[in-house]
Every structure is written in structure tokens, then in C-alpha cells.
């Protein structure tokens, strides 16, 4: 039986402080691997066939901060450049617009790579632990942050509960593939309070906002329940859920503490408002999310 923990404790959130990272140095035995999957909240534009991550270039391609939807670094970039305590290399398969399974919840374009497609990319590349990415069960942390588009695209559907069961079956089917490839450390990020995005607040009635919030809660409850079953089934796992609602709400409830005039403005500079656009968090919220992940794995990966 594996270890399953849910973490909401964010010791540094009150000040928004960042952990001090050791300088990135040449690859050595302490090198760690952050292997991630998700949607635009996680994407950095990485192409596994391009320049590979290295000690001096932890994202590989594009260079830091990558091609993100935050206006700068997102949570992945922060983890490998500011919260790392040793060389940490990012293999980020996340793709903007992704859903878990495109046959259950279609993405906005058919060319979008779903979580299933992303895991297939992993399986066809670094799953075999090539010389350029010699990850193993101890030095690799697998991160998944998906569900924003799953919930956002179908929260209103009268068959939402049934769809959610199908989504979770697909989600944990992909985790099983990763486990079978040797993954043992998993961090799953919950769906944040998307009902607080400017897009939802401006375009939905209070009743619909409450309904979407309920759909988010149902998703996150299902995520926790399915992870517990997954760790019971598979041995040697350390798995943690990071409740992204905590960093989001911390910033949104205290916008001026994070350099924004209010909780609903957005700006593509990613800095002067909490939101990059009307649906994507800017740099400060991403920093807080990264901090939450780092705190959850303090002493082992960060």
C-alpha cells in the first residue's frame, strides 16, 4: 500500500515569500526530474524532440519562463528555477486546452493533446529512461494538474456525475501507465476555484457560479477518493494532493498584498493583476501554487 496525503498547509503563504534555491549546477547524482502533465495552467511549450533540459536550462525548450499562460513563470518554472534545492529538470508534456479524455470532454480544438495523448508522448520518449533523462522511482516526481477544462466544459451537463466517473477512470488509467513505467512519486493538483475567474464572474449568474463551484468540489472529492483506491491497489507509492484552492483564495482574498488593485482585473504582463487574462492566473498565483507543491515535498524534492 502506498502513502496518500492531502496537503493544504502552506507555511509561507501569508507573506508570499519564496524558498531560496541553490544555484543550478552541472548534472550530478542529486539531479531530480519533474515530469508533468496538464493544460494551459501548466504548459511551457516543451517539445520532447527538441533541446533537452539541462542544469543550465531546466526547461529545455523554450528557455525560461517558457511559453506560458501566466505572463512569465508558471508553477512548473518556479519549481525548477526558484524552489529547487538541487538541479531539477522539467519534462513538461502539458498542452493548452487539454482535457483528460477528448472522447469524454472534447477540447476546444481537435488538435489539442489530451492527458491520454500526453502520457502517450511520455511512453514514446522518456518512459524508457534514456541516457539524457535517467529518471528512476526515487529521483522523479510526476505532477498532474488537469481538470480545469473538464469541469469548465461540462459542469452544466445534467449527466455531470456520470461524466465525472468516466473522467476519473481515464485519469487513473493514465496514472497506472505511469506507475507501470516506474513512477512512484505523484503530486496531483486539484481543480482551483474557477468560479472566481473573471470570465465566470462576468458571464454567469450567481446561481451558475454556485453550480460551477459545486462541480469543482465534486471533482476534487472524486480525485481524492480515486487516489486513495489507486494507492491501495499499487505498492510503493507516495502520492499527495495539493489543494490549489488555498493559494488561489489566499491571493484573491488579499489582492493588494500581491500587487493587484482587486481580485478581478487581468493584464497580459502577468504582474499588475492577479490574472493574466480572464481565465488564467498570473505570476503571483503561480508562485503560490509552486510554493504549495514545494512545501508538500519539502525535504524530499524541494
Swiss-Prot record:
Query: InterPro entries of this UniProt entry?
Result: GDSL (IPR001087), GDSL_lipolytic_enzyme (IPR050592), SGNH_hydro_sf (IPR036514)
Record's GO cellular component, any one? extracellular region
Keyword line: Glycoprotein, Hydrolase, Secreted, Signal
State the signal peptide span.
1-21
| EC class | hydrolase
Q: Where in the cell is it found?
A: Secreted
Under the heading CDD domains, the entry gives: fatty_acyltransferase_like
Give the primary localization class: secreted
Give me the glycosylation sites of this protein. Answer: 84, 101
For whether the record's keyword set contains 4Fe-4S, the answer is: no
Give an example GO molecular function. Answer: acetylesterase activity
* Recorded catalytic activity of this chain's protein: an acetyl ester + H2O = an aliphatic alcohol + acetate + H(+)
Q: Explain the purpose of this protein.
A: Acetyl esterase that acts as an exo-deacetylase. Liberates acetic acid from xylo-oligomers.
Which family does the similarity line name? Answer: Belongs to the carbohydrate esterase CE16 family.
> Can you name this protein?
Acetylesterase
Amino acid at each position: 500500500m502506498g502513502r496518500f496525503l492531502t496537503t493544504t498547509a502552506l507555511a509561507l503563504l501569508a507573506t508570499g515569500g519564496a524558498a531560496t534555491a541553490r544555484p543550478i549546477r552541472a548534472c550530478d547524482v542529486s539531479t531530480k526530474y519533474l515530469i508533468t502533465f496538464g493544460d494551459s495552467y501548466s504548459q511551457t511549450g516543451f517539445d520532447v524532440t527538441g533541446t533537452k533540459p539541462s542544469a543550465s536550462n531546466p526547461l529545455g525548450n523554450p528557455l525560461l519562463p517558457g511559453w506560458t499562460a501566466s505572463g512569465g513563470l508558471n508553477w512548473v518554472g518556479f519549481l525548477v528555477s526558484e524552489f529547487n534545492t538541487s538541479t531539477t529538470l522539467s519534462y513538461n508534456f502539458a498542452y493548452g486546452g487539454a482535457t483528460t479524455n477528448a472522447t469524454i470532454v472534447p477540447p476546444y480544438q481537435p488538435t489539442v493533446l489530451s492527458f491520454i495523448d500526453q502520457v502517450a508522448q511520455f511512453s514514446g520518449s522518456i518512459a524508457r529512461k534514456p541516457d539524457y533523462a535517467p529518471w528512476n522511482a526515487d529521483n522523479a516526481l510526476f505532477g498532474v494538474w488537469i481538470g480545469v477544462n473538464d469541469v469548465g466544459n461540462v459542469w452544466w451537463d445534467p449527466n455531470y456525475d456520470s461524466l465525472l466517473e468516466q473522467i476519473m477512470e481515464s485519469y487513473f488509467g493514465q496514472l497506472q501507465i505511469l506507475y507501470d513505467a516506474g513512477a512512484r512519486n505523484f503530486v496531483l493538483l486539484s481543480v482551483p476555484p474557477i468560479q472566481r475567474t473573471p470570465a465566470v464572474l462576468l458571464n454567469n449568474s450567481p446561481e451558475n457560479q454556485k453550480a460551477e463551484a459545486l462541480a469543482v468540489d465534486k471533482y476534487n472529492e472524486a480525485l481524492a477518493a480515486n487516489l486513495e483506491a489507486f494507492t491501495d491497489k499499487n505498492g510503493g507509492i507516495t502520492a499527495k494532493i495539493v489543494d490549489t484552492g488555498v493559494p488561489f483564495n489566499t491571493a484573491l482574498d488579499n489582492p493588494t498584498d500581491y500587487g493587484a488593485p482587486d481580485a478581478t482585473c487581468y493584464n497580459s504582463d502577468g504582474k499588475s493583476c492577479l490574472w493574466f487574462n480572464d481565465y488564467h492566473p498570473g505570476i503571483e498565483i503561480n508562485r503560490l501554487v509552486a510554493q504549495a507543491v514545494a512545501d508538500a515535498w519539502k525535504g524530499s524534492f524541494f
